[in-house]
Amino acid sequence: MEERSDSEPTPGCSGPGPAPVRDGGGAHTWAPEDAWMGTHPKYLEMMELDIGDATQVYIAFLVYLDLMESKSWHEVNCVGIPELQLICLLGTEIEGEGLQTVVPTPISASLSHNRIREILKASRKLQGDPELPMSFTLAIVESDSTIVYYKLTDGFMLPDPQNISLRR
């Protein structure tokens, strides 16, 4: 393998080199600046947030692609929350609806009740409407790029009646 002379770490990146690489703890670390996504404008925008490491940026980018391409969300933007060291995605699932906060996280991450509460509060600020109930969608990303979404709220939420199918 040829060594690159310009292999300085990118801000927010754990280091140069192709991805994925498995470290001793079994978790994946990614540094895909040589891959096509390393030149994608949204990936570069996430890197410029200078939050977290290459793994967090990679996971956020995978969730972004899933929301835009598979789930056909109308608009998705990335926002950094420096005090929580998080990259969040803000978007609208359907044009004209309110903003939703999506928090990409690796499957290996552990979230305490306090951490979830901090994310709920930050999400409310990002959505800009203090009247809305505190909520965010947790996007859990597996090492094979499988993504599972869970909506977390502050307390119980009744389901939207139009989304309930009637049984007969």
Curated annotation (Swiss-Prot):
Pfam families in the record: Sen15
Localization per Swiss-Prot or TrEMBL:
Nucleus; Nucleus, Nucleolus
The yes or no answer to whether the keyword tRNA processing is present is yes
Swiss-Prot/TrEMBL GO biological process terms? mRNA processing; tRNA splicing, via endonucleolytic cleavage and ligation
Q: Which domain of life is it from?
A: Eukaryota
Cellular component per GO? nucleolus
Alphabetical keyword list: mRNA processing, Nucleus, Phosphoprotein, tRNA processing
Broad class of the protein's primary localization? nucleus
Against InterPro entries, the record matches this protein to: tRNA-endonuc_su_Sen15, tRNA_endonuc-like_dom_sf, tRNA_intron_Endo_cat-like_sf
Task: Give residues where Phosphoserine occurs.
Answer: S7, S165
SUPFAM superfamilies, alphabetized: tRNA-intron endonuclease catalytic domain-like
Q: Which GO terms describe its molecular function?
A: nucleic acid binding
Return the annotated region ranges for Disordered.
Answer: 1-32
Q: Where are the transmembrane segments?
A: none
Family assignment? Answer: Belongs to the SEN15 family.
Assembly information from the UniProt record: Homodimer. tRNA splicing endonuclease is a heterotetramer composed of TSEN2, TSEN15, TSEN34/LENG5 and TSEN54. tRNA splicing endonuclease complex also contains proteins of the pre-mRNA 3' end processing machinery such as CLP1, CPSF1, CPSF4 and CSTF2.
Annotated function: Non-catalytic subunit of the tRNA-splicing endonuclease complex, a complex responsible for identification and cleavage of the splice sites in pre-tRNA. It cleaves pre-tRNA at the 5' and 3' splice sites to release the intron. The products are an intron and two tRNA half-molecules bearing 2',3' cyclic phosphate and 5'-OH termini. There are no conserved sequences at the splice sites, but the intron is invariably located at the same site in the gene, placing the splice sites an invariant distance from the constant structural features of the tRNA body.
Protein name, entry field? tRNA-splicing endonuclease subunit Sen15
- Name the species this protein comes from: Mus musculus
Instruction: Please state the gene responsible for encoding this protein.
Output: Tsen15
